[in-house]
């Protein structure tokens, strides 16, 4: 392969011509077969994802014109001397893409020529995809590279003419430029300049040469500014440090030109200190040790806090007052130890105090002092700084300082006793003494590990640990009987000596480890302490007796008291009581006695973990400790220990016999049906019992009508079963679920009782028969349709036009939750009135529903004309109670215009309702009220009723004088049989909604004479 692309094209001219001739004549060439043998169209995938750019040229000129032109974007003719002028490529023709398919069309003619074309295309394929100068060394370009061939590219480019070079940087940059120049990856002209500049710079630095003046070389530096930017390669040994320094010099977002200007003034500055911290922090050994120490300190504090709250259990009725701010009181107590006059007496007393504390302390002394007090001076300084840190009030420190002088003299008197005593546990209560001493040492521990000797007094140390507080503080409200308020003054008098004594002696409130001190004490004269030197023993006994009396008195009344074991602190010599005079004087200004209302309980922690932790529990099951969040993606059961937080009696919450809580499946109602039935029966029975005395009933049409109805076994409905427990007018036709079986309906026939006993469910159904059924169904049957499979006597619906029984069983079993429109071939809904026990007076009191689609049909003489009425959608009741009584009648309340509540859809009334003026009944019956009607509208409805009439000749024989008129109407039914039933239904719906709501009791009685008219 040639090292130059142009020479490569020129040297391959003969081969290219052979390719062209071979493509034109479709002949094979042995020379191309030697180069690439065995190539076939099946091996096209070896070429990669590129599309073949082979072009079929007719002659040499066409070939040169259509060959690729490898353009150089920044060459500017710098490489023209390397290119043969006769072989300059003109550019790629646009018809190259149009001729792509020609190669593939001719490829099937000769396989050897295809192999040669593939070889030709391989030579150009690697150069056609680049817009920069391609590498001439094609062999190295085709070699696949792995991670070992990755070369770190320089991150910065500097001006080679003005940059201050290091010798290692010069050599590394020079090597990098030479390497890139050999691989033809850089501009050759610029690479030559960079190589020359780097070599000159290296020679200057190596030989310590001086810079040549610009005037010597005739260079106008001010006007002719020349830049020669190139890559700079850092030294690999100090790469990390140098890169960091140069990044700081360069600044964020600076370009190459500004980087040179920024780097000059920043070299002398402390750039490392001003550098921002990296995002990914790598902790040093110092930080690890410091964090570990802070963690240990936090654990020690946590332990001390737990011990403080645990001491409340030992003394739950301890001295509680408004000054139970442990932090503030601890600061006051520590101030009296560390703010002292620098005298020999106090120093000796403090030494004895600290040496005594070391023996009784349970927390290791962090200062490292020995029993001889060798480190007492350092400890005193640290304690002094700690006291300065916690001190908040300067005046308080002054008052404490005066008390300290008295206690210092007391400790001086008892110094020999403290140093010579072999037994360090001389306290009546060693536990409380140890707690107090541990608190004193803990202050020193806190000041050592958390404070800087020069800065801790001003600002606290940040806690870098991220942790979650699982501590639960608990308290309890205290209630006192009213009788205790009378004894408060006596309690205060009994506690005067004790309070003052304990305030001077720094007693422990509630047996906590935090020493407390009164805030409001006045300065006590020094001579009182001197006077006390002669009364040490007597005062000790007095304070003990006073404390004991106070303790017994407080135990009797449940108030505040201090145990006697805490009052005898004077034996230790560390704290000595003051004189009686000072006690009396200071008690007048001491804090007022305040009754506590809140009692602190021991704190607890939230316990949570996996199911393995619960295996050791008292119960095997999780019980109600299982998390109720069932939508979690945890791989274990999340346990929450409720008993650790609520310390009350939780025995009723615990499961029995390892009973676990399970999730209720979706769709299951936890409200039992038994509870609903009980509530429903209660409401329903009350409604029935309260309305039994006001039950209006439908009046029977006549004795003949009743005889005809039972003789023909029509599907009639008993109005004794018709009542309502609702007073709403929108609930005339509603779904109900009343199952009842009462004995007050024994006069009904047997078929009625069978239908009532099987009525259940909430749905609409068609009536089982029309006109020829042997069963008389009541209104209750419409509200409670029986299941067809449970009814032994199945009634087939009657065909509407022919009067025959419809044997379609689907119609029998149809239970529809929503009423459907009535088709001409479907059965009818009827509303029959069949009651043998009805009276005329009851019928007069019977109001009809307002919002219904019913058609009131008259009982024709000698015929029965049930009407076909369309269904109507109803609003369901919000509650659907059930009753065990299957024969409880739904009745309309006498004193309300509310409609009846029945469960039928659309029903046709067969029977007689006394009509009022301008009502449907009077018009259809054709009685005396005909003259008052709208003839055009009423005639249309009457004609519809005639069309719906079923021809039943057997029933015409039982009619009275009106048989001739009935026969004439049946003839009109035959003539108008082509009338659409849908139109009749619409007319009936409109007229029913217009007239049925206006029936009144006052209009019923005058219309009894028109029962038999049609």
UniProtKB/Swiss-Prot annotation:
Subcellular location: Nucleus
Further comment found in the protein's record: Present with 2560 molecules/cell in log phase SD medium.
Modified residues (Phosphoserine): 75, 242, 254, 311, 421, 490, 570, 572, 576, 610, 614, 680, 898, 980
Residues found modified as Phosphothreonine: 73, 896
Compositionally biased intervals (Low complexity): 104-115, 722-740
Lineage of the species this protein comes from: Eukaryota, Fungi, Dikarya, Ascomycota, Saccharomycotina
Region Disordered: start-end pairs: 1-63, 90-144, 236-270, 340-463, 531-557, 570-591, 690-897, 959-982
GO cellular component, one term: nucleus
Protein name stated in the entry: Resistance to glucose repression protein 1
Function (record text): Involved in RNA processing and negative regulation of glucose repression. Regulates the level of two antigens, P43 and P70. Binds to protein phosphatase type 1. Functions with REG2 and SNF1 protein kinase to regulate growth. Might regulate SNF1 directly or indirectly.
Domain of life: Eukaryota
GO molecular function: protein phosphatase regulator activity
């Amino acid at each position: 392969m040639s090292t130059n692309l142009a020479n490569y094209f020129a040297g391959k001219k003969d081969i290219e011509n052979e390719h062209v001739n071979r493509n034109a004549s479709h002949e094979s060439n042995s020379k191309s077969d030697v180069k690439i043998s065995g190539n076939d169209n099946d091996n096209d995938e070896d070429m990669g994802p590129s599309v073949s750019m082979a072009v079929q040229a007719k002659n040499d000129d066409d070939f040169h014109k259509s060959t690729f032109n490898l353009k150089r974007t920044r060459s500017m003719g710098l490489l023209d001397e390397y290119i043969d002028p006769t072989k300059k490529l003109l550019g790629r023709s646009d018809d190259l893409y149009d001729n792509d398919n020609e190669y593939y069309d001719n490829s099937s003619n000769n396989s050897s020529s295809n192999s040669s074309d593939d070889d030709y295309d391989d030579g150009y394929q690697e150069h056609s995809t680049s817009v920069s100068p391609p590498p001439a060394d094609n062999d190295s370009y085709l070699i696949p590279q792995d991670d070992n061939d990755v070369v770190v590219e320089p991150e910065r480019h500097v001006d080679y003419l003005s940059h201050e070079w290091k010798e290692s940087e010069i050599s590394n940059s020079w090597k990098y430029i030479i390497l890139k120049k050999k691989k033809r990856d850089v501009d050759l002209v610029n690479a030559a300049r960079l190589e020359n500049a780097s070599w000159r710079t290296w020679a200057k630095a190596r030989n310590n040469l001086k810079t040549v003046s610009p005037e010597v070389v005739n260079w106008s530096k001010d006007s002719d500014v020349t830049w020669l930017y190139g890559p700079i390669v850092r030294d690999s040994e100090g790469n990390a440090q140098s890169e960091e320094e140069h990044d700081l010099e360069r600044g964020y977002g600076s370009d190459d030109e500004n980087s040179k200007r920024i780097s000059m003034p920043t070299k002398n500055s402390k750039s490392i200190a001003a550098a921002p911290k990296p995002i990914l922090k790598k902790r040093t050994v110092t930080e690890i040790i410091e964090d570990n120490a802070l963690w240990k300190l936090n654990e020690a504090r946590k332990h001390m806090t737990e011990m403080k709250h645990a001491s409340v259990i030992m003394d739950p009725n301890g001295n509680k007052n408004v000054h139970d701010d442990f932090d503030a009181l601890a600061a006051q107590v520590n101030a009296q130890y560390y703010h002292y006059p620098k005298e020999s007496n106090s120093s000796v007393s403090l030494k004895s105090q600290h040496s005594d504390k070391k023996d009784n302390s349970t927390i290791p002394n962090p200062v490292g002092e020995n029993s001889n007090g060798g480190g007492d001076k350092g400890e005193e300084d640290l304690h002094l700084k700690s006291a300065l840190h916690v001190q908040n009030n300067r005046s308080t420190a002054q008052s404490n300082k005066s008390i300290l002088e008295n206690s210092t003299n007391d400790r001086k008197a008892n110094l020999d006793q403290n140093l010579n005593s072999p037994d360090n546990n001389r306290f009546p209560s060693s536990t409380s003494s140890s707690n107090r001493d541990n608190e004193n040492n803990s202050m020193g521990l806190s000041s050592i590990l958390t404070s800087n000797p020069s800065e801790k007094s001003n600002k606290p140390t940040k806690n870098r640990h991220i942790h979650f507080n699982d501590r639960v503080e608990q308290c309890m409200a205290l209630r006192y009987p009213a009788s205790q308020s009378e004894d408060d003054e006596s309690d205060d008098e009994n506690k005067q000596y004790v309070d003052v004594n304990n305030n001077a002696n720094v007693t422990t409130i509630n047996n906590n480890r935090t020493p407390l001190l009164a805030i409001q004490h006045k300065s006590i004269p020094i001579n009182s302490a001197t006077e006390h030197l002669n009364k040490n023993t007597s005062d000790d006994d007095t304070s003990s007796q006073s404390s004991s009396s106070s303790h017994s008195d407080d135990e009797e009344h449940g108030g505040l008291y201090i145990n006697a074991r805490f009052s005898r602190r004077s034996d230790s010599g560390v704290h000595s009581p003051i004189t009686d005079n000072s006690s009396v004087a200071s008690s007048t200004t001491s804090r007022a006695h305040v009754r506590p209302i809140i009692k602190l309980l021991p704190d607890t922690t939230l316990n949570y973990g996996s199911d393995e932790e619960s295996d050791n529990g008292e119960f095997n099951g999780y019980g109600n400790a299982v998390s109720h969040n069932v939508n979690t993606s945890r791989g274990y059961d999340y346990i929450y220990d409720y008993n650790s937080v609520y310390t009350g009696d939780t025995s009723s919450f615990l499961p029995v016999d390892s009973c676990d809580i399970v999730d209720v499946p979706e769709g299951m109602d936890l409200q039992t049906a038994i509870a609903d039935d009980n509530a429903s029966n209660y409401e329903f029975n009350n409604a029935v019992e309260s309305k039994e005395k006001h039950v209006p009933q439908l009046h029977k049409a006549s004795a003949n009508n009743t005889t005809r109805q039972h003789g023909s076994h029509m599907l009639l409905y008993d109005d004794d079963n018709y009542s309502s427990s609702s007073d709403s007018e929108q609930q005339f036709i509603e779904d109900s679920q009343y199952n009842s079986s009462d004995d007050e309906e024994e006069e009904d026939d047997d078929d009625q009782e069978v239908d009532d006993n099987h009525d259940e469910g909430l749905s609409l159904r068609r009536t089982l028969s029309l006109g020829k059924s042997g069963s008389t169904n009541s209104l209750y049957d419409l509200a409670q349709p029986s299941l067809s499979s449970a009814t032994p006597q199945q009634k087939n619906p009657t065909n509407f036009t022919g009067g025959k029984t419809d044997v379609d069983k689907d119609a029998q079993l149809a239970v529809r939750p929503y009423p459907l429109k009535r088709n001409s071939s479907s059965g009818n809904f009827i509303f029959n009135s069949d009651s043998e026990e009805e009276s005329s007076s009851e019928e007069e009191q019977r109001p009809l529903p307002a919002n219904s689609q019913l058609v009131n049909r008259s009982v024709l003489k000698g015929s029965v004309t049930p009407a076909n009425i369309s269904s109507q959608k109803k609003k369901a009741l919000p509650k659907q109670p059930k009753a065990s009584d299957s024969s409880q009648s739904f009745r309309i309340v006498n004193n309300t215009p509310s409609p009846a509540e029945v469960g039928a859809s659309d029903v046709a009334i067969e029977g007689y309702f006394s009509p009022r003026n301008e009502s449907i009944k009077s018009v259809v019956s054709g009685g005396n009220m005909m003259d008052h009607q709208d003839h055009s509208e009423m005639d249309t409805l009457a004609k519809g009723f005639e069309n719906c009439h079923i021809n039943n000749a057997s029933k015409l024989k039982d009619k009275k004088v009106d048989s001739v008129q009935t026969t004439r109407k049946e003839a009109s039914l035959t003539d108008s049989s082509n009338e659409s039933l849908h139109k009749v239904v619409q007319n009936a719906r409109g007229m029913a909604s217009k007239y049925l709501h206006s029936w009144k009791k006052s209009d019923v009685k005058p219309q009894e004479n028109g029962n038999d008219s049609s």
